[in-house]
């Protein structure tokens, strides 16, 4: 399953000390790095309690993948209810996707932002993309763009 492989890669990046487990601290730090926002202690503890099936206070890879899969499934149900938002996001994505590759590259992001009056260099655009580039390919797919816009 491709999504599961992607979640496993994300798990590896969250597991900063390489012990095969994600602590509440690692989860909080990675959410901040990914979304640029702090997650309140209560939310971190609630997620940990929800997913920690063996009760050790840590998330192993299997627990993490199950949590993310369930969260994604819940998100899919909510997305079905909001077709207009999705249509608008697709239109916005098409404006940023200028190279015909079906994704937003650092260069296409730079060009569109310049048209909108914000002048960033390619490295700054790469950093923006990196925050939401879940599969690590250096570009934003529509799903990654949607995640960024909904954050």
UniProtKB/Swiss-Prot annotation:
EF-hand domain location: 2-37, 39-74, 84-119, 120-151
Q: What does the record give as the organism's lineage? A: Eukaryota, Viridiplantae, Streptophyta, Embryophyta, Tracheophyta
Annotated function: Potential calcium sensor.
Q: What domain of life does the native source organism fall in?
A: Eukaryota
Q: What GO terms are given for molecular function? A: calcium ion binding
- The UniProt record gives the binding positions of Ca(2+) 3 as 133, 135, 137, 144
- Which keywords fit this entry according to its UniProt record? Calcium, Metal-binding, Repeat
Which PANTHER family does the annotation name?
EF-HAND CALCIUM-BINDING DOMAIN CONTAINING PROTEIN
Enumerate the residues binding Ca(2+) 1. Answer: 15, 17, 19, 21, 26
One Pfam family named in its UniProt record = EF-hand_8
- Native organism is Oryza sativa subsp. japonica (Rice)
Annotated residues for binding of Ca(2+) 2: 52, 54, 56, 63
| Protein name as catalogued | Putative calcium-binding protein CML23
């Amino acid at each position: 399953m491709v999504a599961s492989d992607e979640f496993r890669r994300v798990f590896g990046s969250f597991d900063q000390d390489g012990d095969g487990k994600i602590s509440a601290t690692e989860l909080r730090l990675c959410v901040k790095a990914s979304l640029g926002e702090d997650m309140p202690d209560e939310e971190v503890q609630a997620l940990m309690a929800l997913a920690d099936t063996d009760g050790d206070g840590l998330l192993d890879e299997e627990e993490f993948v199950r949590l993310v899969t369930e969260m994604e499934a819940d998100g899919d149900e909510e997305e079905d209810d909001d077709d207009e938002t999705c249509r608008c996001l697709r239109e916005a994505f098409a404006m940023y996707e200028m190279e015909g590759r079906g994704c937003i590259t650092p260069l296409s992001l730079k060009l569109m932002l310049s048209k909108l009056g914000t002048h960033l260099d390619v490295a700054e655009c790469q950093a923006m993309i990196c925050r939401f580039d879940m599969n690590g390919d250096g570009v934003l797919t529509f799903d990654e763009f949607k995640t960024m816009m909904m954050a």
